[in-house]
Amino acid sequence: MAPTEEANVTKPTGELRPDEKLNYEEDVKCSGSSSTTVGKTAYDTDDISQSQAAELQDLARQLSRASRQGGLDVENEPQQVINPFLDSESDPELNPDSKSFNVAKWLKTILQITSRDPERFPKRTAGVSFRNMNVHGYGTAADYQSDVGNLPLKAWSGIMSMLGLRKKVRIDILRDFEGLVKSGEMLVVLGRPGSGCSTLLRTLSGETHGLYLDEGNDIQYQGISWEQMHKNFRGEVIYQAETETHFPQMTVGDTLYFAARARAPANRLPGVSREQYAIHMRSMVMSMLSLSHTINTQVGNEYIRGVSGGERKRISIAETTLSGSPLQCWDNSTRGLDSANALEFVKSLRLSTKYSGTTAIVAIYQAGQAIYDIFDKAVVLYEGHQIYFGNAVRAKEYFIEMGFDCPSRQTTADFLTSVTSPSERRVRPGYESRVPQTPAEFAQRWKESEDRRILMQEIDEYNKTYPLHGEQLQKFQASRLAEKSRSTSKSSPYTLSYPMEIKLCMWRGFQRLKGDMSMTLTSIIGNIAMSLIIASVFYNQQETTDSFFSRGSLLFFAILMNAFASSLEILTLWHQRPIVEKHDKYALYHPSSEAISSILVDMPAKLAVAIVFNLIIYFMTNLRRTPGHFFIFFLFSFTTTLTMSNVFRSIAAVSRTLSQALVPTSIFMLALVIYTGFTIPVRDMRPWFKWISYINPIQYAFESLMINEFHDREFKCAVYIPSGPGYSNVSGTSKICAAKGAMAGKPTVSGDVFLRETYSYYASHMWRNYGIIVAFFLFFLFVYITATELVSAKPSKGEILVFPKGKVPAFLKQSKKKQDPEAASTQEKQPVETSGHDQTAAIVKQTSVFHWESVCYDIKIKKESRRILDNVDGWVKPGTLTALMGVSGAGKTTLLDVLANRVTMGVVTGEMLVDGRLRDDSFQRKTGYVQQQDLHLEISTVREALTFSALLRQPNTTPYEEKVAYVEEVIKMLGMEEYANAVVGVLGEGLNVEQRKRLTIGVEIAAKPDLLLFFDEPTSGLDSQTAWSICTLMRKLADHGQAVLCTIHQPSAMLMQEFDRLLFLASGGRTVYFGELGKHMSTLIEYFESKGAPKCPPDANPAEWMLEVIGAAPGSKTDIDWPAVWRDSAERVEVRRHLAELKSELSQKPQTPRLTGYGEFAMPLWKQYLIVQHRMFQQYWRSPDYIYSKACLAIVPTLFIGFTFYKEQVSLQGIQNQMFAIFMFMILFPNLVQQMMPYFVIQRSLYEVRERPSKTYSWIAFMISSVVVEIPWNALLTVPAFFCWYYPIGFYKNAIPTDAVTERSGTMFLLILIFLMFSSTFSSMVIAGIEQAETGGNIAQLCFSLTLVFCGVLVSPTAMPGFWIFMYRLSPFTYFVSAVLSTGVGRTDIVCAANEILRLTPAAGQTCMEYLGPYTKFAGGRILTPDATDMCEFCAVADTDTFLKGVNIIFDERWRNIGILFGYIAFNMVGAIGLYWLLRVPKRKSGVKQGQQPQKQANETKA
């Protein structure tokens, strides 16, 4: 940081001469308004910034160059120049918080100031030139779907490939690319999906995960090599992906403030602090992108309410802008924005490039002409080939000269991309045989062109002007160095110093906590509740030997609760990982800075939880009540919490996928619990697993807690042997305390002796253990911090199709065998042209007319009624394609939902009729609704998804064969033959965007809708060619008798010509126009022109012209109230007359047989169930990750437990160990439960969002099938779980003396099956009514903890406070433990181990039998030396039944307990169905108030 950077200096003066004023604001007017004034906030004001500085310097670079070239004379300006950062109030146009703010003037002013001091503000620009750029990857164009049967084979193939024993298939993605984009220029990248647009951007920006550059690539950034730019100057060339990754809990203002502060330079304008800089830059960018009104709104995501999707996209744009990179690659960043906001975004880029010299490379879909005209250059890609690069204006002429024709009113961008589509390009007459046909031919024509020769000449000249490692590199380095904090190293790509990064990340961490306190509060409240419950169970422990086991149990439970308090941090870290990796690529901060800051930010919450939990536990249970011992207890507990937090963070950081983190973690946690030293003492551990205890931090903590509690302490004996009648006068060495460590004749037992005899613990180990725990803490802290810097998340694969095994198409197999790069490329296959008859002829022609009149829709917002739709009229007739258009927020989708009977709240009034009759229960299943989101079951193939819809939604009277045959017709009609057997999958591994949209349409057509088809934004987010293909498909459907109503967002003129009628809505849901469009939309244009609108230019897009006419386009205004004009027009009178005519005539017409079915569903419930159950089984079979994870949980932990307690002896400790083996088996429960929930949620989401509204099948069929599908897998997995657990432990040996080995083995097998069935049905019950799997998992975990505490293992029912006995009886695990333990060890003699034998002296003159015989008759036990007279050896428990009675287990009740467990399973099933009905099934027909407008009547129902 420069010494003067914080000093207040005189503001520079000077102004531009009038004749030299930059006038670009006239060309690109980019001004925003802000409804919120940003005052000085309590942000940290330390040395933290660079992101915004980079941007300012970018601006400075351009102007200083202009000034040197004579473009600006800023040295001799007499008038004072305002510093916008300090004095913007004096000029509203420079104040981002003012409605008059002008971005162009602001930029000009900043550059005017910075250009006066080129030494303080050295400029930095980065154009890019590239030649011989070839990029390839490895993989296949198709893959076969994994399922339970073929996963091992697939895994083996993967291992072979990793070892290099199987040759990879090379896929060429980009071939021989060359280009030049100078600083200050904008390049638009055009091409169809799969043509390589994203790869081009990723390569230029250094995002090359999974990509490989060929030898000989020549990519230079204005004198800087590709390698040097992406190593030493990371963040100077950045890639902005399509996806939005932000912290949802943070406000928009804080999100952007963070980005501004992280890149705030050291060489800011004089007198401007980092805080002032960051706040002002944030306000400027928010104003520029019309985000000012969202400054205090949370960003949100799909689960957390926040800003809209379009606003979230603009936040990503703002964040990238604030990074201030001289070269920015934008990958489809306008996706999700309407055309107005997309245009504003591109204009803002133009301003940045013009004034600051930045370079923008933008891949954009559906670019309107106004957007395209802003760009300087264009590049056109065709399946990995470059077929044009050059001047954007020249591009159109280049292809016309080649022989292609551009239709009137087609935008240049659409024309250029249509050239790459054989079915859409138009050839001029006479050129049919002369134009290129294949991508290679296009590329060859480009290489032979004069345009390419000129380009290569320009590249040569450019590279000579900026030679590698020349003066430009030094300037670039000097510019970056000027921005960096003084303590930042020269080679670092980051602007801030490391401590500044940590401080800034801590600020953000606390803002995130403040934005969502629910997790912290839930954790504190949950821990208070759990501590109170546990403390009450172990309440006020007596200082006698009776408390030995319960004190151990308590400390065991306490240390586990402390240790695993941070286990969910794995999920938290994974959710934020994409954000941190993105910011690292932007060079905002080190990932390790975020790692350290997150530890520090979490510390107060951890400390609060630890204090509350441990205070309650310690003092309510009467643990050793001295200050010193409490603080030792707290110190070890809290240190263990921190250590285990680092352990879980390290696991998350070193894993490249979430499953890599979660599966080992569950087994890892099980190992830590078992080898803590309580469930199996150190001396009893088997040698092959004993090493685990040495690397287990919890084991050291538990030992120290036990030493802290028992060391140097005497416990009064609670029970003597012998005692009772006849032994009242026994004293001295003739009696002994019934506890380990007891000495004959001594009334107390030493805590130290007890620890030594039972656990092999020694007091000298306590502080040694603390040192070991701290060492673990430091080691895992180092691993965590190092891993965050070195390990990145696994990138997604390239776009490939996936097929079931054996169904990969022949053409893809051939490409794989021949290793033909072009055949194997990720190209998008064209729809197959079908020969013969038109496949759409198979569509059933619709005959009904759907018409509506005076439709209004009102909802209540903050107790005030708001009208969303206002007296909308219209109709849809068979064979017509009707467009529903309007400005953003006009209510287009809402009208579609109201008409389709899909709204769930509010008041709907008006008439909606089918052939003059009211809609009935069957209306929803008789209509098709193509939703905007393409929601399908990922594991289904295209054909299966279509068949599922046809089987369930076509009438029951239609034969099965006819339904299946119709599906084949739909596949041919939609051109889906090549991928009919392809799996839906996910984007990247499955269908691409267009294929998904076609499937969404196909699913609705396969249902043979009797009435009409609704389409909601079918072209949103698609490229122009895909949008065109979807519109032509809708046109084809309409031409064959379908009635189609489609919402569409500002389409091109070409798309609009496909529609017959238009319903146009203004804001507030008011009608602006309803009627015919006419040829070339002449009818529509005539209507508006006749009502006073300006003439529509011949080359204009009527859709955009119409928006300008009504004042809805950016910058447009109108004095005409167009909804009022429509309301009073003759056209509306004619619409009303025709509606009345339809109502009277059609109501008299008899209904066709297909329309007389009034049932809610097409199929009976039992058929629904069979079809849905079949799909559910199919889903599980094709989800090998889930099944094999489930199998791992059934095999690995049980095997681990089995060999941990291998061949346990029938001693007192052995029986207790066997009881703990059962206890450990139950710990699998939460993992099994949480594992199932996400799969249920996926199915339920699909059902509730798409299948339930369309009345595909009943919720009853869905719930029953989702519960039943688990049963066969549970039965199958019972086999390995039984053998891996039952036999290694040696339960079968206990049954040998009773001759009941077979019976007991069968009973144990049944009990394990019951356990697995209980787990799955309990999971179904918990998640049935809950939205998120995480919430369900937390509830299940809480229930599990309670049932585990009260099942009688850790605390016997006799030691339990009377209040909690009801929980003991309520816990299902009580009956499971009872049944398993009695089956496993019942009716067996106990053989005491040497350290369990009690030794005492008999009374004088008596043998041991004579002395202890009476005692054994009423108290039990076995005399091992009956004839001895000097020393008796006595085993306190003779048989296992006596041991079982001590924990309230009776052998003869095991079958009763099994019956009770079946009752719990049945309860879970009924509960799952009941909770789903209660919480998620709409209770009334429509869930809305409905009424008929003329009568103004509404039947009220609650949503």
From Swiss-Prot:
It comes from the Eukaryota. Induction: Expression is highly induced upon exposure to voriconazole and itraconazole. Is highly over-expressed in strain TIMM20092, an azole-resistant strain isolated in Switzerland. It catalyses: itraconazole(in) + ATP + H2O = itraconazole(out) + ADP + phosphate + H(+); voriconazole(in) + ATP + H2O = voriconazole(out) + ADP + phosphate + H(+); fluconazole(in) + ATP + H2O = fluconazole(out) + ADP + phosphate + H(+); (2R,4S)-ketoconazole(in) + ATP + H2O = (2R,4S)-ketoconazole(out) + ADP + phosphate + H(+). PROSITE patterns: ABC_TRANSPORTER_1 (PS00211), ABC_TRANSPORTER_2 (PS50893). SMART domains: AAA. GO terms for molecular function: ABC-type azole transporter activity; ATP binding; ATP hydrolysis activity. ATP binds at G886, V887, S888, G889, A890, G891, K892, T893. Keywords: ATP-binding, Cell membrane, Glycoprotein, Membrane, Nucleotide-binding, Repeat, Transmembrane, Transmembrane helix, Transport. It is found in: Cell membrane. It is a multi-pass membrane protein. Residues 14-29 have a biased composition (Basic and acidic residues). It holds the Pfam family ABC_tran. InterPro entries: AAA+_ATPase (IPR003593), ABC2_TM (IPR013525), ABC_trans_N (IPR029481), ABC_transporter-like_ATP-bd (IPR003439), ABC_transporter-like_CS (IPR017871), ABCG_dom (IPR043926), ABCG_PDR_1 (IPR034001), ABCG_PDR_2 (IPR034003). The chain crosses the membrane at residues 519-539, 554-574, 599-619, 628-648, 662-682, 771-791, 1186-1206, 1222-1242, 1259-1279, 1310-1330, 1346-1366, 1458-1478. Residues 1-46, 816-838 are annotated as: Disordered. GO terms for cellular component: plasma membrane. Glycans are attached at N8, N332, N463, N729, N1499. Residues 153-408, 850-1093 form the ABC transporter domain. Disulfide bonds: none annotated. Disruption phenotype: Impairs the resistance to voriconazole and decreases the resistance to itraconazole of the azole-resistant strain TIMM20092. One of its GO terms (biological process) is xenobiotic detoxification by transmembrane export across the plasma membrane. Belongs to the ABC transporter superfamily. ABCG family. PDR (TC 3.A.1.205) subfamily. NCBIfam families: 3a01205. Pleiotropic ABC efflux transporter involved in the modulation susceptibility to azoles, including fluconazole, itraconazole, ketoconazole, miconazole and voriconazole. This is ABC multidrug transporter MDR3. The gene is MDR3.
